């Protein structure tokens, strides 16, 4: 009697399973948070308060940062994308903070006048919380 072979027994099924495992592994978690060379997380924390980021975002370690307009920034190091478009690397997150409208014109996040250096400091804080 011929029994049907399980889907994963075929070479194509095994390749598909391996690809799925690889893609799921890239979705988040695991590994250390990236570092931001030359940036200061304590300065970033102060800048988050100065620019009022907590009015729209929930941010760990920042007093009264319990906004609900924008996404929570808690556990930021686990993110893989910013605004669903940009890879969440320190460089791209800093670019987003400096000029979010450039990357997503319909975003409600305002351009606040944050300099590139300040953005790197903010990113350093977000990745360390």
What are these regions (language model features)?
Residues 28-30, 56-63, 78, 127:
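Detector for the c-type heme attachment site
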Residues 46, 64-129:
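Extracytoplasmic electron-transfer domains, predominantly the class I c-type cytochrome c fold
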Residues 53-56, 122:
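Hydrophobic packing within well-folded, soluble alpha/beta domains
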Residues 2-16:
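Bacterial N-terminal signal peptides that target proteins for export
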Residues 28-49:
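Electrostatic cytochrome c docking/interface patches
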Residues 23-26:
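C-terminal motif of bacterial Sec signal peptides marking the signal peptidase cleavage site
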């Amino acid at each position: 009697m011929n029994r049907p072979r399980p889907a994963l027994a075929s070479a194509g099924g095994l390749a598909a399973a391996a690809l799925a495992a690889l893609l799921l592994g890239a979705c988040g978690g695991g590994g250390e948070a990236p570092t931001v060379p030359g940036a200061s997380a304590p300065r970033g924390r102060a800048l988050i308060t100065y620019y009022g980021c907590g009015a729209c975002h929930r941010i760990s370690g920042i007093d009264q940062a319990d906004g609900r307009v924008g996404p929570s920034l808690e556990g930021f190091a686990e993110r893989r994308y910013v605004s669903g478009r940009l890879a969440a690397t320190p460089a791209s997150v800093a670019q987003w903070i400096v000029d979010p409208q450039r990357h997503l014109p319909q975003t409600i996040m305002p351009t606040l006048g944050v300099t590139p250096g300040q953005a790197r400091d903010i990113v350093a804080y977000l990745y360390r919380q």
